[in-house]
Amino acid sequence: MQKYTSEARQLLALAIPVILAQVAQTAMGFVDTVMAGGYSATDMAAVAIGTSIWLPAILFGHGLLLALTPVIAQLNGSGRRERIAHQVRQGFWLASFVSVLVMIVLWNAGYIIRSMHNIDPALADKAVGYLRALLWGAPGYLFFQVARNQCEGLAKTKPGMVMGFLGLLVNIPVNYIFIYGHFGMPELGGIGCGVATAAVYWVMFIAMLSYIKHARSMRDIRNEKSFGKPDSAVMKRLIQLGLPIALALFFEVTLFAVVALLVSPLGIVNVAGHQIALNFSSLMFVLPMSLAAAVTIRVGYRLGQGSTLDAQTAARTGLSVGVCMAVVTAIFTVTLRKHIALLYNDNPEVVSLAAQLMLLAAVYQISDSIQVIGSGILRGYKDTRSIFFITFTAYWVLGLPSGYILALTDLVVDRMGPAGFWMGFIIGLTSAAVLMMLRMRYLQRQPSSIILQRAAR
């Protein structure tokens, strides 16, 4: 029992800074929306449309680079710290190549935006302008993620938290300058949010790089030599590990986007109620997602040390803590669902629907916690390919079709509207949780030599 208590303390010590970093990141998006809305409703809508395209593109790169965390954690645990700098250099090369692809996609996103049904031309122009300003921040964002993953792989999660709040503090005044045109800068409205956010990502990267350069704990792995050439073997391995994570993230983001589009013809009340419940459940998701990042670090580190039993302890402890958190947040959601909905909107119909959907959200929080922490465990074992297949099957083969049938057809029951899609979420997330646990159990039952051989690759 004592080893589980000790492991839980270490997991929470790693997870809490990640939670706070995610809060800072979410707050940046909130600030952009509010400040753009203060300028005009059109600018706020342009930022919202631009963000809906930016997120899938940049999260694909983000997911690809998540491969660095278990690699570095395993090298750290095995005492091969001298190899970490080379892995990080290749991470920067990979981020550079992905940045170019993301920038090309975002530069040409105008074709997607202008093809939207009945979109106002002025709104489309502002959304395109926002993306074309923001895309210059893509390299800064991805370079920052490489540096952050280096720190987190070494069990240093506080720097990411500090840089997140630094970015938030810088974002507010820089937004003000470029939205309203102060200190000699042009008045750009919502496009100014894109300029500000791009600048903030570069500030965060430079600050993180400065920390790494001066941190005593990283003195032995600091790269003082030339940057070096791309290493095709290392980059291939990072892509093999990272691509399934990137695709899983992409399919998860696009799933919720598709559901939002399917709900949109059902009327303003349904759209608003769905959005409130989804926004709140996304905030609650920060907790298990951050714990999953901590579990990846601990499992990778323990496997690096050559202890499959300690890796199992880390995995089981992470799941136990995650389920306890989910039970607490589910009770909180059920108890205060009407009060929470009133914070977003005071329309009685919207509040009533949002409160009903939050009941379903409370049900799936436990499944969601298990599946996302399960994904973190599998990342720690470097078994990322299964994450993609499980996510795709659970979300797109089981969750979305069942949600569509329940919400918009009479095949099983009378049309349920948005609640049908939320039943689909429950089916998809529960399926993912079960499949993740089965895969984890299969991996942990293999001989230690095979587990450690996979982890050392």
UniProtKB/Swiss-Prot annotation:
Keyword Isomerase: no
GO MF, one example: antiporter activity
Gene Ontology biological-process annotations: sodium ion transport; xenobiotic transmembrane transport
Subcellular localization, as worded in the UniProt entry: Cell inner membrane
Topology relative to the membrane: Multi-pass membrane protein
Matches recorded under CDD domains: MATE_NorM_like
Keyword Membrane: yes
GO cellular component, one term: plasma membrane
InterPro entries for this protein: MATE_fam, MATE_MdtK, MdtK-like, Multidrug-R_MdtK
Source superkingdom: Bacteria
Transmembrane spans: 11-31, 53-73, 93-113, 127-147, 160-180, 188-208, 243-263, 276-296, 314-334, 357-377, 387-407, 418-438
Keyword annotations: Antiport, Cell inner membrane, Cell membrane, Ion transport, Membrane, Sodium, Sodium transport, Transmembrane, Transmembrane helix, Transport
Similarity section: Belongs to the multi antimicrobial extrusion (MATE) (TC 2.A.66.1) family. MdtK subfamily.
Cross-referenced NCBIfam families: matE
Function of the protein: Multidrug efflux pump that functions probably as a Na(+)/drug antiporter.
PANTHER family hit by this protein: FMN_FAD EXPORTER YEEO-RELATED, MULTIDRUG RESISTANCE PROTEIN NORM-RELATED
Name recorded for this polypeptide: Multidrug resistance protein MdtK
Organism (species): Salmonella arizonae (strain ATCC BAA-731 / CDC346-86 / RSK2980)
Gene that encodes it: mdtK
